[in-house]
Amino acid sequence: MKGIKEAKSGTTLAGKNKNSYLNRLRKLNFVNTKIDAVVCQLSTNDARFGYEIGEMSQSFNLESFDTETTLGAIEYIIKYVQTKWCCPVIFYTCIRENDVTYKQLVNHLYRLKTKWDIHIIDVYNNDELNKLAKSDKEMMADDSHPTKKGYRYLYTPILVKQLDEIL
């Protein structure tokens, strides 16, 4: 399996910004390439930049999602990927200290998991990883961004293990 990194620092799931997850996703054009899965971070930036969480839609129609809200953008991404590439969609959550909005977003993601049959790699609720991040201050650059050491010892092992299980 080969990975393609399309992440950009400081971007959001929701919104019409040219660097939003949605706009970057729409620009991807993989010709004659089998996509094994799309892995997407549950952004910590949406709340910081003032996007509302929104509501889970009852619809499965791509055009009905409110992409100016985080949940609407997530549902759009899921439907877009499932339609365009017919592959699993995997969201991973982040270590985030004292952020009630992010906790709510993680809880909503589990409701979306049921609706859309997506996968979640839950770093946010992983007690072992959170304890390790708190005990070694070199793991995190701030309350939500891992350092290289944090990626190496916190995120990479759980992502590799769970991606192997999912795929």
Locate predicted features:
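N-terminal secretory targeting modules
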Residues: 1, 28-36, 82-83, 156, ...
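Loop/turn elements at helix/coil->beta-strand transitions in domains of secreted/extracellular proteins
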Residues: 1-4, 33-38, 84-89, 115-119
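Conserved SGNH/GDSL esterase-like catalytic core that processes O-acyl groups on lipids
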Residues: 1-64
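Extracytoplasmic/secreted envelope proteins and their assembly/folding machinery
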Residues: 22, 71-78, 106, 156, ...
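Active-site segments of SGNH/GDSL-like serine hydrolases
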Residues: 41-45, 75-108
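A short acidic, glycine-rich active-site loop
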Residues: 60-70, 143-146
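Aromatic/hydrophobic pocket-lining residues that form the small-molecule binding cavity
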Residues: 67-70, 74, 151
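Catalytic His-Asp segment of secreted/periplasmic serine-dependent ester chemistry enzymes
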Residues: 94-167
